[in-house]
Amino acid sequence: MAQAEGTPDVPSMGRRQFMNLLTFGTVTGVALGALYPVVNYFIPPSSGGSGGGVTAKDALGNDIIVSEFLANHNSGERTLAQGLKGDPTYVVIEGEQTLAEYGLNAVCTHLGCVVPWNGSENKFICPCHGSQYDNTGKVVRGPAPLSLALVHANVSDDKLVFTQWEETDFRTGEKPWWV
């Protein structure tokens, strides 16, 4: 066949060169995939900036709309929601149409069971080993060594937003153990 004028001969890639390139690409991809979690471990998490919170979700995974939530719940109730890191978190209703400024992580500090609210006794009682917490989540009976973790509960655009609690624990007067 005749070549068109002005087009140089382009040598085709040999089989060995193609296999070397394919092997190099595969090894590189596997190495990068294996290194990603290691590198990601050493990168500190973002501080979250001004919007570092998580919108609370109900049992169906829908955002909690505060006006609707308060209309359907009574004063003194503690209702589970999905909070920071997906942990079950209690939304505390303090007064008429008022949410507490804090939420309670519902994971027991003993062995990680979800602690249900016992309204008749006005406390949280762990079903696994009997730890008890008062209505603010402060441990009152072991074997749990620590109080339930706190989160800030704020309202933004009529949605409930949980943010990390880093201040002094108002129940104990000490630095929070969960930070």
Curated annotation (Swiss-Prot):
Catalysis: reaction(s): 2 oxidized [plastocyanin] + a plastoquinol + 2 H(+)(in) = 2 reduced [plastocyanin] + a plastoquinone + 4 H(+)(out)
Function as written in the Swiss-Prot or TrEMBL entry: Component of the cytochrome b6-f complex, which mediates electron transfer between photosystem II (PSII) and photosystem I (PSI), cyclic electron flow around PSI, and state transitions.
Cofactor binding, note field: Binds 1 [2Fe-2S] cluster per subunit.
Superkingdom of this protein's organism: Bacteria
Entries under PANTHER family matching the protein: CYTOCHROME B-C1 COMPLEX SUBUNIT RIESKE, MITOCHONDRIAL (PTHR10134)
Name this polypeptide is given: Cytochrome b6-f complex iron-sulfur subunit
Signal peptide: none
GO molecular function: 2 iron, 2 sulfur cluster binding; electron transporter, transferring electrons within cytochrome b6/f complex of photosystem II activity; metal ion binding; monooxygenase activity; oxidoreductase activity, acting on paired donors, with incorporation or reduction of molecular oxygen; plastoquinol--plastocyanin reductase activity
Record-level GO BP terms: photosynthesis
Residues that bind [2Fe-2S] cluster: C108, H110, C126, H129
Organism: Trichodesmium erythraeum (strain IMS101)
